[in-house]
Design a protein with these regions (language model features):
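A short linear-motif detector with a strong N-terminal bias
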Residues: 57, 77-78, 129, 166-171
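Mid-sequence acidic-hydrophobic segments that form the walls
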Residues: 70, 102-109, 125, 129, ...
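C-terminal end-helix/capping segment
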Residues: 154-178
Length: 198
């Protein structure tokens, strides 16, 4: 059952809260370790994260779909694609240049072996890419590597959900998350799900 795969409703306080327990029942296990999580090509996950910067989830998904119809989500294809083609998909110049730099660095091996590195080392490596900051690296840790304990306190959706459900101000989010170590990615995922729940 999903509950058996959960990182222990009894093992940490996440599901002791009635609101979070309800989200767990509705949405099932979060897609991070130790639960099964999708294995996806690192370049594609990062490209999607760059596209998603400062956009709503829905707008980002539409833009990524349009982009990948024009340019396949591989480093080689993005290296060869003219900048104008990336702009034609609806990307800002800054995002188009970031994706070109990501493609070049991926071809040089920057994305190799990330799954063997600690979270901090992954962030350090990824933020060498133009236009990739802490938020984009955190999204990759979660959705590219399935890391269970990422707490992206700068994320606007997370801030909105935490304020709505728990009355937590943005500056209090780091301390609020401490109680949920080592499964803060799971907490973030349920908070995001809450934004699309009645």
């Amino acid at each position: 059952s999903p509950r058996a795969r959960s990182p222990g409703p009894r093992g940490f306080g996440l599901f002791e809260h009635p609101v979070l327990a309800a989200f767990y029942r509705r949405h099932g296990p979060a897609p991070f370790a130790p639960n099964p999580f999708p294995q996806r090509p690192p370049f594609r996950v990062l490209a999607e994260s760059v596209v998603a910067q400062q956009l709503s989830t829905r707008a980002a998904a539409r833009l990524a779909e349009r982009l990948f119809r024009l340019v396949p989500p591989t480093p080689k294809a993005f290296l060869e694609a003219p900048l104008d083609l990336l702009r034609q998909a609806g990307l800002s110049r800054a995002k188009a240049l970031a994706l070109k730099d990501l493609a070049a660095k991926a071809e040089e091996g920057l994305l190799d072996g990330l799954d063997r590195l600690e979270d901090e080392a992954v962030v350090e490596r990824l933020t060498r890419v133009r236009g990739v900051g802490l938020w984009t690296a955190e999204m990759f840790l979660m959705f590219g590597l399935g890391r269970p304990d990422v707490w992206p306190v700068r994320d606007l959706g997370l801030r909105r959900a935490a304020a709505r459900l728990f009355g937590v101000a943005p500056e209090a989010l780091p301390a609020f998350g401490e109680a949920f170590r080592p499964y803060r990615s799971h907490l973030a995922w349920y908070l995001w799900r809450s934004l699309s729940s009645p």
